[in-house]
Amino acid sequence: MDKLQVIIQKLRIKAKDYFDKDASGHNVDHLERTLKYALYLQSKEGGDKLVIGISAYIHDIHRIMSNEYGRYVSPQESIPIVEMFINDLDLTKEQKEHILHAVEHHEEYKFGKEGVSVFDIESLILQDSDNLDMCGAVGIVRAFKYGFLNGMMDYNPDVPLYNNSFSESKNDASTIHHIHNKLLRLADNMNTKTAKKLASKKTKLTKDFLKMYIEETTGNYS
């Protein structure tokens, strides 16, 4: 095993009990998929492989904290816990700082109020990797899991679907609204050329799903 594989194996042991608490789609399976995307993007786009791989595997600690605290916890608030995960890893001080930086900024969106504030390839790849797991078939499944956990309706036909109303999932009128308002935008939100190509294919599937779902639930067949 190379150095990254050894470190990820250590993180798997640390992360298992912590992330097994999650039922919202931010569990170990999500971390493993995000890691795969991150390493693929790194192979095409470059960047520090250790920083990218490790940050991909521990980026969602704030989601577990959100479940525990009963409120949204930002990535910034999770940094002390993230530090505990990486303190004993065989990394340089600069690499550890870079991991913390990437994790802190991984939930920035071009269509969000604040936009994207980072430009280093490691942070951009982490954003893309996390967002790719919200696209396509897996993204749809995760959206419904999150919606169910937060008591959201699957679909509320009384509320129009708008293109300009992004919010956190639990504030949307239904899971279908969240898929429409956020997941459909992710292809245009990707930072790297490689991620844009992957997301474009996934987004076509999401659009087809939404069209069919609304037809089946409203009876407005086309």
Question: What residue spans do the PLM features occupy?
Answer:
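Short gly/ser-rich anion-binding loops that grip negatively charged ligand groups
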Residues: 24, 68-72, 89
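His-Asp-centered metal-binding catalytic motifs of divalent-metal-dependent phosphohydrolases/nucleases
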Residues: 49-68, 74, 78, 99-109
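An active-site-proximal "capping" alpha-helix that borders the catalytic cofactor pocket
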Residues: 34, 73-87
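Divalent metal-dependent phosphate-bond-processing catalytic cores, especially two-metal-ion Mg2+/Mn2+ enzymes
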Residues: 2, 19-28, 32-46, 58, ...
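A short, mixed-charge helix-start or loop-turn motif at secondary-structure junctions
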Residues: 16-21, 64-67
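Short alpha-helical hairpin
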Residues: 1-16
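Hydrophobic, well-structured mid-protein blocks that either form specific transmembrane helices
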Residues: 89-125
